[in-house]
Regions:
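Structured, non-membrane catalytic/scaffold regions adjacent to prosthetic-group chemistry
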Residues: 21-228
Length: 228
């Protein structure tokens, strides 16, 4: 009877601890949304389970690559009529856009009103001639990192191959010299240090997708992991 009583006390103690932690976590997100409203910001811009930060957290796997001048290039290939490779100077010589949008990381932070400059992915694909059977794109980055995106999502007005952030070259820690930006999906779908875009006729899991992350990654549906 004593053992049972002790077990009940221990169990109830664990339950209280979990409850308190959950309450603190919920309160943090609630406070963050209240702060948005106090600043006159539209809280509906913040996906569920996210918090707003003014910082730009750095999260990645592996080392940060470095490039000698002229070393970086981007290849466009797969199911296209005319594959090609661009140097950084050639990429920057193409018609560019400067766009401002919110970004959302799967690790729960969001950052509003980020400004990026680059070339629309759809313009690069127009140069290559995407074959009619194409449905998806694999982003290939340094060190073998990959992530998959539907063709329709990476060819919107907002999806770009970016080389500037807030008016300056993208810092290496944030994916420079060039990264993808697909702002309406969780930000792991916007590969840092991108080196090639491969057009596919099917959906193929990339690095994180093979390791439990969602194949699509809509932040407003909280599609973080398999089954979400």
């Amino acid at each position: 009877r004593c053992v049972g009583h002790t077990t009940k006390l221990a169990t109830s103690g664990i339950a209280r601890t979990i409850s308190m932690r959950q309450t603190r976590l919920v309160s943090f997100f609630e406070r963050n949304r209240q702060e948005l409203k106090a600043k006159g910001l539209d809280a509906s811009r913040l996906p569920p389970g996210q918090y707003l930060t003014d910082r730009f957290p750095v999260l990645h796997v592996g080392d940060i690559p470095s490039y000698a001048p002229g070393q970086w290039n981007l290849s466009i290939g797969g199911l296209v009529d005319a594959p090609f490779v661009l140097s950084l100077d050639e990429l920057k010589a193409l018609p560019s856009v400067t766009l401002t949008y919110d970004i959302h990381c799967v690790t729960k932070w969001s950052k509003f009103d980020t400004t990026w400059t680059g070339v629309r992915v759809r313009d690069l694909f127009a140069m290559a001639g995407v074959k009619p059977e194409a449905t998806h794109v694999m982003e290939h980055a340094e060190f073998g990192y990959t992530t998959n995106v539907p063709l329709a999502d990476i060819t919107t007005d907002e999806a770009i191959v970016a080389y500037e952030f807030d008016g300056a070259e993208i810092e290496p820690i944030h994916g420079g010299p060039v990264r993808i930006v697909v702002p309406h999906l969780y930000f792991w779908k916007s590969a840092k240090w991108v080196r090639s875009l491969e057009v596919l006729d099917r959906d193929v899991a990339g690095f994180w997708e093979r390791n439990g992350y969602h194949m699509y990654g809509d932040p407003f549906l909280e599609q973080r992991f398999w089954g979400d």
